[in-house]
Amino acid sequence: MDIAIRGGYAPNERVQAVRLMDNEFIPVAAPDYLASNGTPMHATDLRDHQGLFFRTPNGPHPWMCEENGQWLDVSGKALSISNNSTWLRREAVAWRGICMTPRWSVQEDLDSGKVKELLITPKVRITQNKNLAIYLLYQKQQYSVPKVKVAVDFLVSHIQSQ
């Protein structure tokens, strides 16, 4: 494999990692869901709501917040758990519950009003690590290969200019 695009944390030094963009997860829900169930204002209010959770190999991403120097699990009741983020986003649009999803993946639905970003305090996260991003990865020695250099340079300039 010449190049890869990965969401998460910066990998180790064995590969070259170029940060393309932030991968901030935000809580969203359909306006009709919020009208029927109320809009959570504080992170702990999420515990009373239906949750749409993304599953990783280690299990569902919890919803967490930092309050008074401690991390709290504020996860809602698990209505659906899936490793298909597109399906989870569709469930949120269909008024099923609250979903923590990357901003870039739901931006079109936010712009159209299909979902609303929940402005909750303190800020809700899926991890204690605040440096989630989308990275372009390649082997350091591969950059000298013309096709890899052209692809890397194009992707970096195209994505970072948006």
Region spans (language model):
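Generic structural signal for helix capping and beta-alpha/helix-loop junctions
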Residues: H61, E108, R125-T127
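Short amphipathic alpha-helical segments and helix-helix/interface helices
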Residues: A17, A43, V106-Q107, V152
